Amino acid sequence: MIVRNLLGKNRLCCLQPKLLLSTLSQRPQLQLSLQLLCRATRLYATVNDIALPKTRNIGIIAHIDAGKTTTTERMIYYSGKSKRIGNVDEGDTVTDYLQAERERGITIQLAAITIPWNNHKINIIDTPGHADFTFEVIRSLRVLDGAVTILDAVAGVEAQTEKVWKQASALKLPRMIYVNKMDRPGAGFSRTVKEVIQKLETRVVLCNTPFFENQELNPEFRGVIDVIHGKLLKWKEADEFGKEIDVEDIDETKPELYDVYCKAREYMVETLGEYDESIIDAFLENDENYLKISPELLNRAIRKATIDNYLVPVFCGASFRNIGVQPLMDGITNYLPSPLETPVPDIKSKKKQEISAKMANNGLIINNDPKLTVGLVFKVMNHATRGPMAFVRIYSGKLVANSMVVNSRTGAKHSVRKLLIMHGDQPEEVKFIGAGNIGVISGFEDEFHTGDTVISHATSKKAVGTMESTIKLMPIDIPPPLFNSSIEPFTAGDEAHMKKCIDILIREDPSLKVHTEEDMGQTILSGMGELHLEIVRDRLINDMKVKANLRDIAVAYKESYIGKTPTNGLFETESIQVKLSIEHVDDCKSFEDVDGAIIFEDQNNVIIVPESLASETVQSATEGRRWKCPSSYEELHEAVVNGCSMALQTGGPHLGLSLHSTLVKVEFWNAPVEVNEELIPPLMNAAREAVQSVKASENKFGFLEPLMNVRVFVDSADMGEVSHDLSQRCQALIHSVEDESLLNLETANWAKDEAERAYLPPDYTMSKTALADNYKTRKVIHAETPLKEMIGYLSKLRSLTGGKATFDMSFLGMRRVTQSRLNQIF
């Protein structure tokens, strides 16, 4: 904790020789500048020299406006990485560097930065909080070892927090909680922690609790009670940068603080004792006195329980007022895991061979080869001065500059010249990226995509074997786009630049899609939401200077094959033939183990091209060395897949909308491979035309529309009017109405019991506001409704409730559109 850093005698004597040892006994009003800690973090040469056990890869996750970026900026400042504090309102943050981010005051894309703290290296990824940018969070979580969840103390556990928490739980990421904005009227630390226990279904330990001055009259948040060390940390009001802290002992002379400290310590020891027997032993050895158990033992137990996902450490603060951030940073280094303490990632081979992986002292070892380097590309972006960048997490080995890497998706080899680590948008060139670290491969236009696995070897350029070159790390799921907007260049001469810029954005953000409606000649952009496409429009027109018109944003409807039985398609010439069938599919994931199946999860489409279904001519030419075609068998096989995929994207027979929930089975294909001629374009066209031939049966195709799960949070007094509006105007099917009160939530029994058992200190600020009473009468309406009817719903909801209600929604699936509904839509 922060107190150990402030009061550790050896450290202080090392850093500040003139500090007298006698002053350390005068602790009640000891005033120390945290600049000492910043100096301590710079005792080593560079952060790249930090050993793997002292490396932390963490994400900052939360609902929008909870204070993620504000907290991250303070962490950067206190680490000594920046000499100023960046503020969202002033548009000068390190991590929010896009023009659109600074203008809107929100995070749009993930940002990575590396900071030093307490002789540790913390790789931080700051993520967006808005639901439209969920994909940025998804791909961040895949490469992290832990996360800090930031909560607004007034709003509590909000909808997007629950979603992100579930995503992190699925990946078994250890997490910490930081209850922010404790300085605001209506802030409820204990109420928020109780929501954490029940809504997020997790145990907690309170590492610190809030301290208020004038708590009976006009409570003012001034610091925290350190439950581990029994200290009161008060941030000096005169210090606007939050570096000077008064550290005081907590004893019987401060009865109210002492009572909170004792009860919080008792709850901590009892919770840890249920997990770690060493805590029970220490409790018994210390005459059953909760206060006598050493901070070192408690820290070890909390760390072990956090990494094991048994519980979550809780901290509090007010980041905008620069209070409470340093203890949070200590918690990150104390409790979240190093890359050596995380589960082995899911590793597969495209050839379906078994891949061995084990954790060693220097990181993951794959296939018993400590010199084999394997990394995952989780983001691609175009830097203003450095050009294309591929962000990569290295899992094993060491990626070295000027080395050869293999992209297992394409099989291509690339010579990597420069490697970087990022500090917001500022790159720093490095010689290598070691296992467990995050860095950037620079200088490649389209060679790396999100989700690619890169493989290299430390000994030679040829050391990556055939099997190793097919290694694939866990995929990154891409959610389906829900909204469309057409884009048209001003003139034909503007089209090339427009397409180039769209390609750049799609490489950066795979949740953004583009296709062309051939009948209308329109280019259609598809995204996750209205804000997502608005940001795309801003970047194209303002940042990239594209001369084009973007039409109004509309719901992304789809067409789909709805015939009850498969329909056959055929295209043939004298030398090329493709025969296939098309049918409807409900769940594309059920085809994961089918031979030759290619799954397009975002559209729920499947294309199956088994290798055994090539013609005898093709197969015999492969086996008999009579192959004359300049393209390989694998490239021709891929051409068939790509041709089918293009046909699905060009749309259905009615309105040319992209096909969804469609299965294409290729039953036979043939090409003259014994002749030396280019076959990829004609074979791709043949597959495309075979699919197109099925579209002639228009009566076998119908429309699908996005269906959403909706939760509306509303006061009891407004519930009737809101429910009526949902069911009538929004055509919603209301499933249930529940109290938002924690006492009535249907959660696991153990979570209810845990919430009742937990010690939670008084919420002084809530007793001074009507928010507490309002909270007790809130209702939650659960419904499902077509996405089209939810466009602009927030403004309508605010109008109905005087701005007091909120809602969230998540994608449920695609639903077939009935004829009566079709008439309403089109």
UniProtKB/Swiss-Prot annotation:
BP-aspect Gene Ontology terms: mitochondrial genome maintenance; mitochondrial translation; regulation of mitochondrial membrane potential; ribosome disassembly
Protein keywords: GTP-binding, Mitochondrion, Nucleotide-binding, Protein biosynthesis, Transit peptide
Positions contributing to GTP binding: 62-69, 126-130, 180-183
Transit peptide as recorded in UniProt: 1-44
Occurrences of domain tr-type G (ranges): 53-340
GO molecular function: GTP binding; GTPase activity
PROSITE patterns for this protein: G_TR_1 (PS00301), G_TR_2 (PS51722)
Stated role: Mitochondrial GTPase that mediates the disassembly of ribosomes from messenger RNA at the termination of mitochondrial protein biosynthesis. Not involved in the GTP-dependent ribosomal translocation step during translation elongation.
Name assigned to this protein: Ribosome-releasing factor 2, mitochondrial
